[in-house]
Amino acid sequence: FEDDHFLVLNKPFGIASIPSAIHSNTLANFVKGYYVKQGYENQQVHIVTRLDKDTSGVLLFAKHGYAHARLDKQLQSKTIQKRYYALVKGSGKLDPVGEIIAPIARDEDSIITRKVAKGGKYAHTSYQVVQSFGDIHLVDIQLHTGRTHQIRVHFSHIGFPLLGDDLYGGSLEDGIE
């Protein structure tokens, strides 16, 4: 979807949202190229929402600074709500509705990963199981805080890592038959 104020795109798995030292093939760079190709006067990319590289989903871009400020304000005041869906797998029982409240900190052994740790920052995740396929569950997730890798860390912490998330204990071999 696109109008004069914002652009909404479906980010595929495997593409980073924003450029970094190791990622130049990003959705933000794609948007910049799109703006140039369209001949837009304002070609500055204002990314409002981001997703991890190995996550697919909807991203929101503001097309000018005023729209970006307004959308940021709406996100802060929770008048725009973000929802996440994930497939998780575990051998125990996953409560049909639950909350995970566990502090998250940087993993001192890695520059990438995070972990649940006493000295970490407060993190709160709510979820509801939408459908189950044996030991695999589709969950509807709402974040009450926005810590790096929060969904991945929290579900791994309770023994239900995200399917395909080998960084936090999910197997790349698993799938739904």
Question: Could you say what each language-model-derived stretch is?
Answer:
Residues 1-177:
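RNA pseudouridine synthases
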